[in-house]
C-alpha cells in the first residue's frame, strides 16, 4: 500500500504541473489539457485519502470527478471547435480581442 504522504505529494505535483500549463500556455487546447490534469490530480488525492482511511468515499468522489472531467472536456472541445472554425486560431490573446 502506498503511504498517504507519497500519494498526496504525487497529487500535488500533478496539480502544480496542470496549473503551470494553464498559466503559461497561450493555446486554449493546452489550457484545457492543463485543467484536465488538475481535475485528475484532485481525483487522485480523493482516492489516496479514501484508501488511507479505509473508506469508499474516495472512489465515489473519483467517479464524480471523472464524470465532471468528461462533461468539461466535451463542452470545452465543442467550444474550441467552434472557435477554430470562426477564427482559425486558438491563441488566447487573439480570442480576447474585441471587435466593434
Swiss-Prot record:
Q: What is this protein called?
A: NADH-quinone oxidoreductase subunit K
**Subcellular location(s) per record:** Cell inner membrane
Role according to the record = NDH-1 shuttles electrons from NADH, via FMN and iron-sulfur (Fe-S) centers, to quinones in the respiratory chain. The immediate electron acceptor for the enzyme in this species is believed to be ubiquinone. Couples the redox reaction to proton translocation (for every two electrons transferred, four hydrogen ions are translocated across the cytoplasmic membrane), and thus conserves the redox energy in a proton gradient.
**Keyword Transmembrane helix: yes or no?**
yes
**Family named by the database record:** Belongs to the complex I subunit 4L family.
Sorted keywords for this record are:
Cell inner membrane, Cell membrane, Membrane, NAD, Quinone, Translocase, Transmembrane, Transmembrane helix, Transport, Ubiquinone
Reactions the enzyme catalyzes: a quinone + NADH + 5 H(+)(in) = a quinol + NAD(+) + 4 H(+)(out)
